[in-house]
Amino acid sequence: MELEQSFIALIEQSIKTNWYLNALTDYKGITLQYRDVARKIEKIHILLENAGIEKGDKIAICGRNSAHWTVTYLAVITYGAVVVPILHEFKADQVHNIVNHSEARLLFVGDQIWENLNEAAMPHLEGIIELKDFEIGRASCR
């Protein structure tokens, strides 16, 4: 438990110390400053809280490496939930199996992957959120 708190404190200190500096950049895409990262983490924390996510619940992330993927990862672990990272190269049936086997409650997903997924194949999933803008995807939270 102490390691977890130390890690979260390190992230918080890094954000506070570097508030106006660039933190994450997508290749030929967006650049987020540390303050942007903090604000997005806070918004995801609110989303997780409103979805009834509790410490230890599993949250799956499937998407290409990006600033938003990283923000989502940081938000989930600092919230106290467990990240289930899924490679974006996996086929839809593999993603379905991992989501189901892990008992993930939510799935953050890149739009390229979402197009190939079948919500009905993940019956226990409570919601799908798009990584590009953190909006509730075509599947809404139950």
Predicted regions, residues:
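Hydrophobic/aromatic residues within well-ordered alpha-helical segments
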Residues: 7, 14, 40-41, 121
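Flexible, low-complexity linker/hinge segments
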Residues: 1-5, 135-142
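N-terminal amphipathic/basic helix or basic patch
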Residues: 2-13, 108
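Structural core segment of the AMP-binding/adenylate-forming
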Residues: 10, 50-51, 78-140
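Conserved AMP-binding/adenylate-forming core of the ANL superfamily
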Residues: 3, 12, 20-74, 91-96
